[in-house]
Amino acid sequence: MTLKIHDTLTREKRDFVPADPQRVTMYVCGPTVYNYAHIGNFRPVVVFDVLFRVLRHLYGEDAVVYARNVTDVDDKINQKAADEGVPISVITDRYLAAYHQDADALGALRPTLEPKATEHIGAILEMIGQLVENGSAYAAEGHVLFDTQSFADYGQLSGRPLDEMIAGARVEVAPYKRHPADFVLWKPSKENEPEWESPWGAGRPGWHIECSAMIDKALGQTIDIHAGGIDLTFPHHENEVAQSRCAHKTSVLANYWMHNGFLDMSGEKMSKSLGNVIIPHELLETTPGEVIRWALLSAHYRQPLDWTPELLEQSKKSLDRLYGALRRAKDVAPDQAMEAPAEVMSALMDDLNTPLATSAFFEVSSAIEKAVTAGDTVAIAANKARLLEAGALLGFLQADPDAWFEGDASDELKAQVEDLLAKRVAARAAKDWSAADAIRGELDALGVVVMDGPAGATWRMKD
């Protein structure tokens, strides 16, 4: 079975063939650490975490090198530090730690490499020097700019003529530019901003050159997969291609380009500038990370995803159903010889079709339920293993089923519930139905839902 990827550059679905199966390389644009990331920022984190898991499954865990950068020099970071009156490192350390905390809670594996822009200034200056020497960049008024007209393939990735790209994007107009689309590689720092010495004067790098330099140092001049949000196609990724190809005189930066769609609210793109953002750092206080992850994977990654409270509710119900099946099968060990269902693998191999993949989970959970009712331990073991393997491929079903349903219940409450359930069992055995109903009422008052089944009663906290 071959993994197929929709390549943004060629506009078609292609068989994935790594340049070196023993070193599969992927790069995803990471955070600018000046504030908490919003839920739209985490869509690529979760989507391409699934890609990372699938590649590890196909080629081996040690064969996949996944780099996700950290932008830790930026105007917004400088402004945040100035507003709070603290060093820049306080801001970047705080929000990078929060980003890691949130990504972990959403079930994203840590990337193999996490290069920071400030740790690659030497590599950035080296690449800028190559571009100037090649005639692809020029110095002007303390700046160094990329000459877009020197690169014949500029615009190929986004598939739009240069004039159209300029009209549809925020392009800085400056008198020192040879062409309006020329972009900054190096610029002078303002007072109290971080700066580094360079052949063109003290300053700091532009955003686009950071990624090109970090890709080169972390992964090489040509990589297998470059991924990110669709909004990065132009100008960021277009500019990366131009810089990297001109600096190295190569024909390809990435063999496959992948872009996830926008996350919308009421049909409008979610963004901090519009003020319509959901912050996972806050949402995670009330919502399990797996629920948020399920919601983020509920639409195909290339399609827009409309974020609503109903989406989270449905995601919670879906996971409750799956965890419920695992809970009822908890006394049977999974059959380690079993693999994820073919339907799940087939869906993932078709350009990461996560909605189709997760829909196949429910057939397996139903098989578990039937096997539990029939007392068929062989079928329970086989299907439990298949469901857990499928979950591992997509980052789901990583919690203990009992803990999933008990939620944030304290140890004291858990003990109280178990005591009441034991008394209810005794009352039912004695056919004292009024006492059993009264106990159920006490449990309801505690916010506990009791579920009777063939293996006895289980419970969960109310949503």
Curated annotation (Swiss-Prot):
Protein localization: Cytoplasm
The keyword Ligase appears for this protein: yes
Similarity annotation: Belongs to the class-I aminoacyl-tRNA synthetase family.
EC number: 6.1.1.16
Pfam families: CysS_C, DALR_2, tRNA-synt_1e
GO terms for MF: ATP binding; cysteine-tRNA ligase activity; zinc ion binding
Domain of life: Bacteria
Organism of this sequence: Caulobacter vibrioides (strain NA1000 / CB15N) (Caulobacter crescentus)
Keyword Aminoacyl-tRNA synthetase attributed: yes
Protein name (database record): Cysteine--tRNA ligase
